[in-house]
Regions:
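C-terminal beta-sandwich/jelly-roll accessory domains of carbohydrate-active enzymes
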Residues: 621-631, 654-732
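Catalytic-core region of carbohydrate-active enzymes that cleave or remodel glycosidic bonds
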Residues: 351, 448-449, 455-458, 479-484, ...
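Active-site groove signature of glycoside hydrolases
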Residues: 251, 292-295, 365, 370, ...
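Solvent-exposed strand-to-loop "edge" motifs in beta-rich extracellular domains
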Residues: 193-198, 236-238, 604, 654-656, ...
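Surface beta-strand/loop "capping" patches
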Residues: 116, 184-186, 609-656, 663
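Extracellular and organelle-lumenal recognition/adhesion modules and their flexible linkers in secreted
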Residues: 71-340, 358-360, 375-389, 432, ...
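An active-site-proximal structural segment forming one wall of the substrate-binding cleft
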Residues: 235-238, 244-245, 266-286, 340-355, ...
Length: 732
């Protein structure tokens, strides 16, 4: 070996082997050779035993370029006595139809404006002005009609009429949402409601066309009779194309009326949702699923709020609704972004059941979006306290829809839709980001009505949009009112930078243990740095790492924090209004962000009981060190849980610093530490804090699970090293 290829150590004696001092770091791959070389020099059995015992620890220290001196080792103590139970709802997901998250995203429909109701405008008084060919191209003689419609709440349809010349064509063309993504060999299910205009049958031809305007596959469909009927055809794509589109031609001279023109991928989950996006959700192992918002629950005005009763029943007759996110940000304007309600409350409940999460539907409290309406206009834009009954009935009827017997009105509808068994709804949110006196005076009536009829139903209230708004006064007022009203949980939202997240690692340590519990319903770390010029560019590793740090505070305070959901959930790379987001999609695929993997690691390692984890800290001027939670001192955050089902201790360590940290973890209550030979560690790490995963490069930052190298045990003390810029989950 050459000198320049080694780490050099001073070894005064075998006793001091563990106190080796790194003199010079060169090529890491020669470290193991060095150990064997030293073994040949020091022909000492005791040394060999000791080296075997400490091999991984010293190797890890060398690889990380840190010294193994005793004064560098942080002394942490974990009390192995199980503490507060961790709720099954602790880590979950929140869905809102923003960033084309539903239509154009999770909802697998490929056709935009399939019922010819867009553009749609809803006046503040509730008048609907709808019907049009938005997102459709027409050629030949195409008319928009509404006489004798197939569906009363979606009355518009098109009539295809022969153009009168054999060389001319009549038809319609739809490019979906930023194109239609089709995959080679996959079947696509076309359907349409049609009727013939004349005495004889009509005929249409359906084509899938690629981005180069070449027809990939086509099918002919006969339309018979003057009554509306549903017709279907299967189209198998011969190749993959992210920007395909669909054409429907009239063949022959007989005219046809067409409505609800639809195209779904054959692999859609339950024939409804995009399979890969559903799998992304299931793989998160969420405990709670909050839906459908968010700001769309409120609406820019109440006439455009999300109304759950319009989102259930026959999908073809669910009326189109505005989506406030199509015009909220003028620099990200998407005029054709509406809510088809194809993904409605019934589908949300089905999805909750499939992914194993408790449903948390959120309903309007009688207030339009307070961001978009001034308090001075309250009497005009909001429902008065005396006129809330319709809104209260919506809440009571929703519970009946979810849980009621099939003998009830809404329970029967659930059964008719295909789910006679109840969904076992346990909680309901009333209001989104509400604040000030307008909210509690309305919520009070909801709580009284719900508790009178469904006393076991948990009610989630709101603390407003921001814990720091107006110096925190609005937030404090919201909490005071929720406590006074007896809400079961209070929803907190925060979108802040890295510094805020670090300062708030201990946020819940001082919360009252009495009264409502915490639901961190919307949160994400928004980086202060300029993001990379890609849609996914704000979902950087550093943001995820700081979220992981803050979540140690959620876990440590499991007796207070009962639920937490990152926001937003989905975003289309060509149609986003808000970022960062947990999962990015295009027309063909998805990418899981570093933030996704943080959520997944917590949700897959929740434990059953929180454990007290502290570090002895000497305060300035103090004579004695005091045990304190590990909440960011020198860049380290930590929490621990016990999983009684697996018999495992799970320790989460987040090192946001630039240097590796050596830790001696005492298992208080045990005479001997768990077997470290079988310990595992899953790490999320990047040397580049601005690293992110993209549609093109999905695996820049991904977790790695392995046997816990570098871990040693002495009596009830385990020694390990957490690399710089790393989130590590240890299982003992």
């Amino acid at each position: 070996m050459q000198k320049e290829n080694l780490f050099f150590f001073s070894f005064p004696s075998a006793k001091n082997f563990g106190e080796a001092r790194v003199i010079k770091k060169l090529q890491k791959e020669h470290i193991i050779k060095l150990f064997y070389y030293l073994c040949t020099i020091y022909d000492n059995t005791k040394l060999l035993i000791m080296m075997k015992k400490h091999l991984y620890a010293t190797l890890a220290a060398c690889l990380l370029g840190v010294s193994a001196t005793a004064q560098d080792v942080r002394q942490l103590t974990m009390n192995t006595k199980p503490g507060a139970p961790i709720q099954s709802t602790m880590y979950g997901i929140f869905f809102e139809d923003i960033n084309f998250g539903a239509d154009g995203g999770l909802y697998a429909e490929l056709v935009s404006n399939r019922s010819f109701e867009a553009p749609l405008h809803i006046t503040p008084a509730g008048q609907r002005i709808s019907g049009g060919l938005m997102d459709w191209k027409t050629f030949g003689n195409v008319q928009l009609n509404s006489e004798n419609p197939a569906f009363s709440r979606n009355p518009h349809y098109v009539t295809l009429i022969d153009d009168g010349h054999r060389e001319k064509q009549t038809g319609i063309e739809n490019h979906g949402y930023f194109g239609m993504g089709v995959k080679k060999g996959l079947k696509y299910d076309f359907s349409v409601y049609g009727r013939a205009r004349g005495a004889e049958d009509a005929r249409i031809r359906v084509e899938l066309v690629d981005a180069n305007n070449e027809v990939m596959v086509k099918k002919t469909v006969n339309i018979s009779g003057k009554e509306w009927k549903r017709y279907t055809a299967e189209l198998t794509s011969p190749r993959t194309d992210a920007k395909a589109f669909m054409r429907v031609y009239l063949e022959g001279k007989n005219s046809a009326d067409l409505d609800h023109v639809s195209l779904f991928p054959g692999d859609a989950w339950q024939g409804i949702l995009r399979a890969d996006m559903v799998q992304d959700l299931k793989d998160l192992h969420p405990g709670v699923f909050r839906f459908p918002g968010g700001c769309i629950v409120e609406g820019t005005d109440l006439a455009s709020r999300y109304q759950w009763k319009e989102s259930v029943g026959q999908v073809e007759n669910r009326p189109l609704n505005e989506n406030r996110w199509n015009y909220t940000f003028p620099h990200r304007l998407f005029p054709s972004y509406f809510q088809s309600y194809g993904l409605g409350f019934y589908e949300f409940f089905l999805l909750s059941e499939y992914i194993g999460a408790q449903a948390l539907p959120v309903l309007n409290v009688g207030l339009a979006c307070q961001y978009q309406n001034d308090d001075k206009d309250a009497a005009r834009v909001h429902v008065s306290v005396d006129d809330l009954q319709q809104y209260i009935d919506d809440a009571l009827d929703l519970i009946e829809f979810a849980n009621g017997s099939t003998d009830t009105k809404w329970g029967k509808l659930r059964a008719d839709m295909g789910h006679p068994a109840p969904f076992n709804l346990k909680q309901i949110g009333v209001g989104n980001e509400q604040w000030g006196p307008l909210y509690p005076e309305r919520l009070k009536k909801f709580i009284a009505a719900i508790r009178a009829k469904y006393p076991q139903m948990k009610i989630v209230g709101s603390s407003g949009p921001d814990p720091d708004d107006k110096g925190g006064k609005q937030f404090s007022y919201g909490w005071e009112q929720m406590t006074k009203l007896g809400a079961d949980l209070v929803d907190e939202h925060y979108y802040r930078n890295q510094e805020w997240f670090m300062k708030n690692v201990a946020r819940y340590d001082g919360y009252s243990r009495k009264g409502p519990k915490v639901f961190a319903g919307e949160y994400a770390c928004h980086i202060k740095e300029k993001p990379a010029p890609t849609p996914e560019g704000m979902n950087v590793f550093d943001a995820a790492l700081h979220e992981a740090a803050a979540m140690t505070g959620f876990e440590r305070n499991a007796d207070v924090v009962h639920m937490a959901t990152y926001a937003p959930l989905f975003a289309h790379v060509e149609g986003w209004q808000w970022r960062p987001d947990l999962i990015w999609v295009d027309n063909l695929t998805t990418v899981r962000t570093p933030n996704y993997y943080v959520q997944q690691l917590y949700a897959m390692n929740p434990g059953t009981n929180v454990l007290t984890l502290t570090e002895d800290v000497m305060a300035p001027g103090a004579k004695k060190a005091k045990a304190q939670p590990v909440t960011g001192q020198d860049g380290l955050c930590a929490s621990a849980v016990y999983d009684k089902n697996a018999g495992k201790y799970i320790v989460k360590l987040v090192n946001v610093g630039d240097k590796a940290q050596q830790i001696a973890l005492t298992f208080k209550g045990l005479k001997v530490a768990p077997d470290v030979e079988n310990a595992t560690v899953t790490t999320l790490h990047s040397d580049n804090p601005m690293a992110c995963n993209t549609i093109q490069k999905k695996s820049v930052v991904v977790p790695t699970e392995m046997k816990a190298m570098g871990v040693t045990a002495e009596k009830n003390v385990v020694t390990l090293t957490v690399p710089a810029k790393t989130f590590a989950v240890y299982k003992f």
